[in-house]
Amino acid sequence: MFFVNQYIMTKQTDGTQKLTKAAYDRDTLYKAQAEFHRRQGNAMDASDTIWTLCMIIDEDGAVYASEKAVKPAEPETEA
């Protein structure tokens, strides 16, 4: 399980920027992770344990992601 805060950044008429909380979108999340890894020169694969904690998408579609490495939780077993 992981938590995601996703925001859309838009420019206002007065030149300021506004962040609006957006709906969770798994496909966009994974694309943001892959792009983050590409820019860092690292490959992203199924063994990654890095989850996006916050990402911002600007009006041009650019995605900014803040990431933190975490260990995945052990799967729960049913008794």
Spans of model-derived segments:
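Short aromatic-glycine-(Arg/Gly/Cys) micro-motifs in beta-strand/loop hairpins
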Residues: 1-21, 50
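Intrinsically disordered, low-complexity regions enriched in small/polar residues
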Residues: 4-5, 9, 26, 38, ...
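Generic structural motif
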Residues: 9-11, 27-29, 59-60
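A short, charged, amphipathic alpha-helix used as a generic interaction element across diverse proteins
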Residues: 16-17, 25-51
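Short, mixed-charge low-complexity intrinsically disordered segments
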Residues: 21, 41-79
